[in-house]
Amino acid sequence: AGSVISVRDAEEAIDAGAKFFVAPGLVPEVVEFALKNNMPILPGCVTASDISIALNYGISILKFFPIYQLGGADTLAQYHGGPFGNVEWVVTGGLNGKNFLPFAEIDYVLASGGDWMFAENNAVTDKNYEQIVINTRSTINDVLEARRVK
């Protein structure tokens, strides 16, 4: 379940069958609820304080949102080269089918999130599911190529 920002959201997500939580920020009550219920959680963390709190909960895979608006790959490199070298990231916010590619080349970025595979060429609006397949395949090929070039 995405955008889990309260315990109530988390409870509703579990009732709906969610297998994990994604949150735009780090809310201690939500993290504690997730851990107590054995639910994986991907909290959004963009400050050294957020990251430190997450690590103290035993969470080292974090969401960085919004990545471009808050410094992009340079910010991640500063964190990785400093005290947070053991953190891995999922980056979201402001990404599209082209500007996500630099993140595909970074070992400590596990994934990028965005709606471009569905939004480009009006795929969802037009209910053009074949276009979604084309967009998704193109994205996968771009990632594979970016990782191969390294």
Show which residues each predicted segment covers.
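Hydrophobic faces of well-ordered beta-strands that scaffold small-molecule active sites
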Residues: 1-2, 21-23, 41-44, 62-64, ...
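Catalytic cores of alpha/beta
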Residues: 6-16, 49-58, 80-81, 95-111
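Glycine/small-residue-rich loop that forms an oxyanion/phosphate-binding "nest" at active or ligand-binding sites
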Residues: 1-47
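Generic structural signal for well-ordered alpha-helices
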Residues: 10, 31, 51, 73-77, ...
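Glycine-rich phosphate-binding active-site loops on the catalytic face of alpha/beta enzymes
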Residues: 20, 24-30, 63-73, 108-132
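C-terminal helical cap(s) of enzyme catalytic domains, especially alpha/beta-barrels
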Residues: 34-39, 122-150
